[in-house]
């Protein structure tokens, strides 16, 4: 057990979805250098269910830098009262990378009355979560003060990365540190932001758009970038030239037309 103090990555894998896992908190307390945790093939997030009060009170998992949730089949959102131990991790100032992969029941990344803000998260990777229609609402996106990289792949219902709901009060969106946005194989995606409020992205360097056949614009409002923005990567070949035409919305429109032309020519052939 003494060797656990050297462990920096733990992967919890459950091959029986009917099994209700329960990992003793005493084991976690013997892992002071644990920085990465992966939970795979798990039907629910009751991994530490019997010891939730201790985990929340002692903040046992707040030193994690990387959290990966892979095929947690009943996960519907993050930030609800059903998984307070997960909320403690996601709101920790140490957490830098969040991966959410193959979660078929995930309907919203952030719960409607969230207990977490992801304020300290720098990188977010979402892959193959087919019930997701958006990642953030207007009311939650400005809390992502340290977010540098978003990658969303193969989420067939995704319509917007940031959604403006009917009762949202208009406000300027500022993602001060966001450097890169990667949007891959999103068949329903129409835009990054669905509203018309001003969008400020002073650190943005590159946007990747690949197989997003419905994406005709980035945002309907004004978009302010700095000279650091290089353009849009519109293919899966990193050495290809970036697309830039006047501004970000015009560049997205150009990529849209290019991909429509490519799709039509491939259909004919």
Name what the model sees in each region.
Residues 1-269:
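Cross-kingdom leucine-rich repeat
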